[in-house]
Amino acid sequence: HRLLEINGGVSEGDTQGTMHFERNEKQPLEADVVIIDEFSMVDIYLMNALLRAIVPGTRLIIVGDVNQLPSVGPGNVLKDMIQAEFCSVVRLHRIFRQAAESQIVMNAHRINSGEEISLENASPDFMHLERKDSASVINVVVQLIMQKLPPHVDASPYDIQVLTPTRKGELGVEHLNQVLQQYMNPADAGKVEREFHGVLFREKDKVMQIKNDYQIRWTKKTSLGDVYEEGTGVFNGDTGIIREIIPVAEQVVVEFEEGKMVEYEYSQMDEMELAYAITIHKSQGSEYPAIVLPVLGGPKMLLGRNLLYLSLIHI
């Protein structure tokens, strides 16, 4: 979206008719080579816009994992292109993120092959902890996040991500966020808090942008508060920390990666939700030092092969 200089739309819910790309056949991209990563997330509308903005002679290199979830929008472009066999395809087999003997790697391959995964806890990067009920599962999740995993992976509890296939239920996003908020960012007289759309937010909460907002302004400031860089756009899946809630101004200040500060009006907080736990789908395109995946049965459609595979490859 940013490469093609989207203009006009505010969120991912807008229709295709309300937004357009500045880059097209009349004002194409000025590049000899265009490389697109995480291509499984591209739908047919975005692919069409991309091709219109590329002039003949430009090389287009597409990088993606066909085993990940397809785009939220219509189409399964990456898979269809590979199956159509009309362009050159190179399959990469060597993995650099984990060691070859990693159980993460082994189990990811087994999931793709439809085989039973190994639960032997034979390597330090993959642990399976069995519990019989949701209360016991939640207790283990809290212990892992707050005590056991941070020293094991040398990361803050805020960097460790809980992934779950569903939003509802005891092990869904909504309930897990309430529980984890109590442990990771408990109420304190020194923290301002406020409820928006039925969810309690407080200063120092971990949050996620859940809609593409191409117009919202962000700034980067020095320690003295002087702005040295600014721009627009916060996107679906971006995570940050609430630094300040200002009741007088009716604003919530969120710091995103690379020090980008965004001032949300209270009316814009429908674009935000707690992010101690997120759905597996929302995690696509991200990477974490460790993840915790609480699963206790459920509908088969929520425990599909591509969801389990996607949850493993983020580490």
PLM feature spans:
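ASCE P-loop NTPase helicase motor core
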Residues: 1-122
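Residue-level preference for the first positions of well-ordered beta-strands
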Residues: 33, 59, 159-161, 206, ...
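Residue-level signature of catalytic and energy-coupling elements of molecular machines
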Residues: 37, 65, 92, 166, ...
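Charged, alpha-helix-enriched surfaces in structured cytosolic catalytic cores
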Residues: 41-45, 49, 55-64, 72-76, ...
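Conserved nucleotide-binding/hydrolysis modules and their immediate coupling elements
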Residues: 43, 181-182, 186-309
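Structural beta-sheet core signal
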Residues: 62, 162-164, 293
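Conserved helicase motor core of P-loop NTPases
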Residues: 66-232
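Conserved small/polar residues in nucleotide/adenosyl-binding loops
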Residues: 313-315
